[in-house]
Structures are given as C-alpha cells and as structure tokens.
Swiss-Prot record:
Record-level Gene Ontology MF annotations: ATP binding; glutamate-cysteine ligase activity
Protein family according to the UniProt entry: Belongs to the glutamate--cysteine ligase type 3 family.
InterPro entries, alphabetized: GCS (IPR004308), Gln_synth/guanido_kin_cat_dom (IPR014746)
Pfam families xref list: GCS (PF03074)
Function: Catalyzes the ATP-dependent condensation of cysteine and glutamate to form the dipeptide gamma-glutamylcysteine (gamma-GC), the first and rate-limiting step in the production of glutathione (GSH).
Protein name (database record): Glutamate--cysteine ligase
Single GO biological process annotation from the record: response to hydrogen peroxide
Amino acid sequence: MGLLALGTPLQWFESRTYNEHIRDEGIEQLLYIFQAAGKRDNDPLFWGDELEYMVVDFDDKERNSMLDVCHDKILTELNMEDSSLCEANDVSFHPEYGRYMLEATPASPYLNYVGSYVEVNMQKRRAIAEYKLSEYARQDSKNNLHVGSRSVPLTLTVFPRMGCPDFINIKDPWNHKNAASRSLFLPDEVINRHVRFPNLTASIRTRRGEKVCMNVPMYKDIATPETDDSIYDRDWFLPEDKEAKLASKPGFIYMDSMGFGMGCSCLQVTFQAPNINKARYLYDALVNFAPIMLAFSAAAPAFKGWLADQDVRWNVISGAVDDRTPKERGVAPLLPKYNKNGFGGIAKDVQDKVLEIPKSRYSSVDLFLGGSKFFNRTYNDTNVPINEKVLGRLLENDKAPLDYDLAKHFAHLYIRDPVSTFEELLNQDNKTSSNHFENIQSTNWQTLRFKPPTQQATPDKKDSPGWRVEFRPFEVQLLDFENAAYSVLIYLIVDSILTFSDNINAYIHMSKVWENMKIAHHRDAILFEKFHWKKSFRNDTDVETEDYSISEIFHNPENGIFPQFVTPILCQKGFVTKDWKELKHSSKHERLYYYLKLISDRASGELPTTAKFFRNFVLQHPDYKHDSKISKSINYDLLSTCDRLTHLDDSKGELTSFLGAEIAEYVKKNKPSIESKC
C-alpha cells in the first residue's frame, strides 16, 4: 500500500451519492489506460515482493507480548528524515491497516533472477525497522516510558491474542468508545491513524447494515468451552451491541471487526509481463496455484486467543471486509427492526438494482481473463454477477473496445460500491488520473490481482510499469530466509510459465479452484487433504483433474511443480542439467538449493508449517489447560520463540526443530553478503 494522501473522507451516507459517478468515471479512466498502454510490448520481467510486519512489544517483566500501537511515527520518519537511509539500502516502507503494522518492499524492482539479493533486501528492511525501534526504546527509557519493554518487527501472519485483554501497549484502551468499528474486542487504536482507515472501517459496517462477522471453528480439546466465552454484554452502540449473541455460533471463535482480518500480515509478489496478452495468460495460469500456496504457507492457527480448527487467514480477512448487505448475501438481517428488508446502508433509489452476490469483495479469483489459445469460456463455470452497464461500455466505445472475457472481469469488479471516497478527489481528469478506477479495483481483494498500468505507460515509456500480475495468497513466514524462498519459488514458476507459454496449458474449471480454496483452510491440509490439480500441463490437454496431496502436487513427475515448472526453467538458465537437486553442489547457486529444499521438505511433510509449529508449541506448553486458549504466558513464550527464530538463534534447538538440522546448520553458517546482488 503506497503512501496516503491527506483529504476529507466522506461518510457513507454522503459518499454513496457519488457511487455511480465514481464507477462511470473509473471505467472511462480504464478505457484511456487501454488506449494508451494496450499496445505496450517487450517489457522485461521486473518483479518485487511486499512483506508485512507486526511491531510487537515484549514486556519481559510482566511476561506479556503486545501489539505496539505507540510507535507508529516510525512510518513517517522512515519516509521523511530517514528517507536517505532507506534509499541507500534500496528499501521502502509503507502504511498498512494496523497502527502496529509496517509494509516494506524493495525501493526498485528486481530484474529476472537476482539470487540471494531478495533475502538480503528483506534483511535490510528488518534491520532498519529494528534500528528505529531501538532508537525509540532509548528515548522512552530517558523519558521513563515503556520501561522494561522492547519492540521488535516480526513477520507474523496473525497475532494470537488479538482482541484479548492487554493485547496492545496502551493503558485502559476502553475508557472511551470505539466509534469506527464498534467492536466488542478491538479498540480503534489498532487502526492506522490516517483518516482513510477508520473511515473505511465505518463505511463497510454502515453499508452492510451490521458489523462484520467472522466465525472460525475452534480447535476441540478436552476442556474447550462449548461457546466463545469472551462475548459480553455492552450498551454503548445500538443496535451493534445486540448483534454478538445472534451472530456468534457454538463451537466457533466470534470476531466482529475489520481489524481481525486486515490486521493480518502476508507476503505478496508482483510480476510485470511482456504485454497485456502475456499478463492475461500468466494470471490465468496462476489461478489454481493460489489455493495450493495458501495451504502450503499456512501460518495462522490461532485467532482472538483461541486455537482454531483451521490453519490460514484468508476467510477471516474475507469476512472482515464483507460489506454485502443481508439482501446481497441472501440471508435475513440479524435485527430486522434496525435493518429493514436487509438493504443495510444502500440508498432507497437503487435498492431495486441490488444483486445477490455469492462472495465477499475479498475472495479467491472469480473469472479467468481468457485471450489465450488454451482458453474456453466454459471454464468460467461459477456464479459470477456482473455490472451490465459497465460490460456494455467496455465492449462498445470509441476509445479501446475490450473483448468479452476481459470486459467481463472488470464488469464483475464493478458490481461493488466504492467504500473510501475523498471530497477532493471527486472530480478528476480521466485522461491522466486513475484514482476512480483504482477506488474499485484496489478494494477487490482476490488471490490474484490483474494490474493495468497508468495512462502514462505508453509503449515508449519503459520507465512506467506495464501490465502486471500480483500473487497474493502467501501467508507471511517468520524468517527472511523463508520469505525469500517462497518469493523465489513463485518467481521461478512465473518465469517458467512465461518462457514456455506455448507449451503450458494450466486451465481447469473455476469451480474446482473455489473448492480448493475451501480445502486450503483445513487444519493440516498440507498433510491430510487432497486438492484438484491438473493431470497434465501439456499444450494438447483439456481441463481434466485428479485429487492430489500437496506433496504430490509439488513432486509428481508427470504434473508436479518441481518437475514441470522449477527444473525446466533452471535447466533453461543453465543452473542444472537434469534436476534441481544438482544445485547443492553449485558454488554459485547453493543457497537456491536450500530455498528449494525448504519448500520440498515442507510440501512433503518432513518439516512443519508455521501453523503446525505454533499449534504444537501451544499444546505442549506447561501452562496450557487443554481448553484451546492461549494465555498471556503462552503467547509471550511463543512470540519470544518467534523472535529467536527470526534471528537464527538456535540456543534452545528451536531453529533445528523448525527448519530441520541440515537447513538450520546451513542458514546459521551462511548468511548472504549484504553487498551481493547476484
């Protein structure tokens, strides 16, 4: 997420009057983009990753670890007085939803294969954040603030005690009301101070007509309560405070705020394709990799102080920004007295146009983009409503008519309302601005994002980014080594897809992808579940699939990721002759071998996922009471372990347990040179 402009945010009941204006103007901006950049070609494979961190405050005296919401000035300083430090180290920091969060990227994109530099750059980002936080600790000590505590940036997918007592480092956060979210569990201090974020939170709640609602299955142990006993009665907000007992379900962890989802962290990787056609092909080819990589990277086994009976974050974020009204969800409102006919905050004059929408605006991919010789329209076999007005405009116009399949993609995105509108940005020059288009585009959060360039990205302007695809499902991992390994893996897959594009047909039915996303949430899916995976990726095959385990999906000689995508591109680059394991004996690419070994060993179940490691830690902790609850002491010890792992500290044998003896020994002895860019 880039730096945020200041402005005057419009509250939902005012902003909704401009919804159609923003949609209309956004589509005109998109047409100007296609007119300007549609013929762009021969762009190089630039790419880059985005890592999200949680700043965790460790109170060693009280044995409590909390989210740090007191030092969010770090973002301003890193982009102002410390900008030269970031520039010199080729890193860039950006805001995220949580006040305790940092997003960091390379300042300039990578070009093709860059070896260990991905990891080096990640190390630099973490080192700079740690340096700033240590500065604050010294200042706080002088001012007698936060005495005895230390704040560190951890790449955690989820904070295990989010929404529990004493989970943020401010005293008495409940001595005032939390008007933006109205959550029973999250004070508004968890939200980024920038006006966009509390306004977005309130707009989603108001449009929906109810608070958001996420029910995640509890992990069942011998003393697990029948219901979520953290729910309590409150009379601050009517009707919201009446919803919890109606919305929660026995045997489930109940969450009621955007922060539970958008406060999670992830790893995202974006790739520039040579042209729009290759970008569409790449997007479609990666669609079914998304649920596989979600399950493979599982790192979220706990929410709101409970162990969950699932391992990933995705459905929690999906629910956290689900602004669909009861009418759009096809359900009755929780409190009909306050949500007449289930239309929520939708204006009366457009209620007759309301569609039933099967999924949240944060979901898996809904449509293949097509345009490839391998594509058949029947592959899009799911219920995907579209904005017919938008579809018509994209198909028939005098600027840049789109083909049906690409037009349908954008027409589907445009069934959504804008949920973040600034007064100063209502009127724009559609020939030069893409803000209205991005207002809708960037608030459709799917497992992949097809990213058009701007109107300035004409074929001769190679300094402007071209047609890109963002891969979004990865859960963030604890170690820079792990995150670099996962980033390099998806780079190799992308490079393989683009290099051998005439020979790789990755299409399956979209309904199978949706089923895979559900399976990916299951506890230990990497070990015990099977997923729909294509029997063959040859160019003469159809969409036939069979059910395979994650290990088979990675290793099967006929259709596995290693033999069909990774090894061929390594051979093409001259890194190996027959098999990726040859890298172990390469003086130049040994680290790549250990990246791929980590991935292979995780996929085969020889090494635990982060989710499995976390769950086992809790279950084996001496303070655990077999009630599925994560106490302060358990959380403190768990996150202290995460801190040690992050810094490759194997003094307690944790790194060896987590990575296996061979990889742990390698990473301890072989830290990449921060000067190396090969």
